[in-house]
Amino acid sequence: MSRMLNQIPRLITRSFRTSSVGYKATLGPILENKSQIQDLVNKSEWNIVDIIKFSEDEVRNIKIDSRVITKMLRASGLKDSLSEDQKKSLIRGLKLQMIFIKYLYEGDEAEFHKIEESNDDVFRLILSDHKAPKPITLKSLLSSIENLENEVDAEKGEIKSSLDISKLNGNNPTYFTVRSNKE
């Protein structure tokens, strides 16, 4: 009898398993009614403080001083003759940006909830993803430079006329010199 059992072919089974991974995160305050949603959608600018919860201890733990700001301004070709209040404002802004970048890379791990583990890879094959971009010509490049001032995007935090090229450091020989018509 045992010989017979050994001779019975075993059934081969195949299975197909799919799984999904879900993440949950809270971004900003909870919206409770239609008017709050409409206000959020119609708001063209935003603030890091509105989105990310952080403590002042986190801000204090980031080591940035006026020397760092001065080096950054010099490396950028900008004038580094700022008042102490302006430097403090730039230091705080840079610290908030570093907190925001850390949040983007690491996420708020306390708010992410992994529903199910998965090692599935998701990809898409769409022709438009693989089309070569339109080549840049001198004419299109020059026209885009002329229209640069009109292409300010408030959603990206860009402010119209926020960079005055006449305030660039014209005495910096290692980078560039900008002369304005005001001189």
From Swiss-Prot:
**What InterPro entries does its record include?**
GatF (IPR027499)
List keywords of the entry alphabetically: ATP-binding, Ligase, Membrane, Mitochondrion, Mitochondrion inner membrane, Nucleotide-binding, Protein biosynthesis, Transit peptide
Q: Transit peptide residues?
A: 1-23
Give me the reactions it catalyses: L-glutamyl-tRNA(Gln) + L-glutamine + ATP + H2O = L-glutaminyl-tRNA(Gln) + L-glutamate + ADP + phosphate + H(+)
Location(s), subcellular? Mitochondrion inner membrane
Role played = Allows the formation of correctly charged Gln-tRNA(Gln) through the transamidation of misacylated Glu-tRNA(Gln) in the mitochondria. The reaction takes place in the presence of glutamine and ATP through an activated gamma-phospho-Glu-tRNA(Gln). Required for proper protein synthesis within the mitochondrion.
**Annotated protein name in UniProt:** Glutamyl-tRNA(Gln) amidotransferase subunit F, mitochondrial
Report the source organism. Answer: Debaryomyces hansenii (strain ATCC 36239 / CBS 767 / BCRC 21394 / JCM 1990 / NBRC 0083 / IGC 2968)
Specify the taxonomic lineage: Eukaryota, Fungi, Dikarya, Ascomycota, Saccharomycotina
Q: Which gene encodes it?
A: GTF1
